[in-house]
């Protein structure tokens, strides 16, 4: 494990339209002690050609292709297994970071002795245009808080691997990131929020996140099968999630 090296975990699948901008946002970081591990879940577009162009230019960028299409959870877990950094950050292959992201968040963690952190983020469209919507995280959140209403943007997370170790991402198609945060919060009491916008989250028209019926099913599986909650608690959390979604409709 290399001290103060940040391992950037990036699963990808058919993201050739966006992944070049994602990689560029990493290369431009003011904090330069990083490795970017891109694990490809058997893309059928031009993802491979784009990524290999950058691996040939920068040895810090590493590319691994799964033997068969297995889902984002398996790709994330593989990237985590391959990582050697003492810190781990997560970046989806269509999201972007401002150039001060790693430096600012590393300083925030060290100055406050935090092991698990996230940040605010903004939404952009498929052409990188701002949607003028900022998603704010909470100052700190525990396991029950994440169960009730997860305030964590996946591509904002950074955690201390030396303190917390590595984790296997629960193998569910959606909400596997939430399941990972819940695992970490069984070991670390809080995730601490940094009140700065340090990520741009891309809203895509064909995103799996847009199918609300499927999301209810994934939530149910997360609560019942992964977290072993009772039927009552699972129904309560799903109803609360639906309430939050409805309350945000203008």
Indicate where each model-derived feature is located:
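N-proximal low-complexity "stem/linker" segments adjacent to membrane-targeting elements
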Residues: 1-27
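Acidic helix N-cap motif at the loop->helix transition within catalytic regions
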Residues: 17-20, 45-53, 96, 100
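Glycine-rich, basic loop-to-helix element that forms the pyrophosphate-binding segment
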Residues: 66-83, 104
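Conserved nucleotide-sugar donor-binding catalytic segment
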Residues: 81, 138-214, 218, 222
């Amino acid at each position: 494990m290399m001290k103060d090296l940040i391992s950037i975990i990036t699963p990808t699948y058919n993201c050739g339209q966006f992944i070049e901008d994602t990689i560029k946002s990493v290369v431009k970081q003011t904090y330069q002690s990083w490795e970017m591990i891109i694990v490809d879940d058997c893309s059928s577009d031009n993802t491979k050609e784009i990524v290999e162009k950058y691996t040939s230019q920068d040895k810090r960028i590493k590319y691994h292709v799964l033997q068969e299409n297995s889902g984002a959870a398996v790709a994330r877990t593989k990237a985590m297994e391959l990582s050697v950094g003492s810190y781990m950050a997560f970046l989806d292959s269509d999201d972007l970071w401002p150039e001060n992201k790693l430096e600012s968040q590393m300083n925030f963690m060290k100055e406050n002795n935090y092991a698990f952190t996230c940040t605010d983020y903004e939404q952009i469209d498929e052409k990188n245009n701002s949607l003028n919507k900022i998603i704010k995280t909470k100052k700190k959140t525990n396991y029950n808080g994440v169960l009730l209403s997860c305030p964590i943007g996946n591509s904002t997370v950074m955690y201390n691997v030396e303190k917390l170790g590595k984790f296997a991402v629960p193998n569910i198609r959606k909400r596997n990131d939430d399941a990972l945060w819940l695992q970490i919060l069984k070991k670390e009491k809080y995730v601490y929020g940094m009140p700065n916008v340090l990520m741009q989250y891309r809203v895509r028209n064909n995103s799996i996140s847009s199918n609300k019926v499927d999301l209810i099913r994934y939530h149910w599986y997360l609560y019942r099968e992964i977290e072993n909650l009772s039927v009552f608690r699972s129904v309560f959390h799903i109803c609360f999630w639906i309430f939050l979604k409805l309350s945000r409709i203008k």
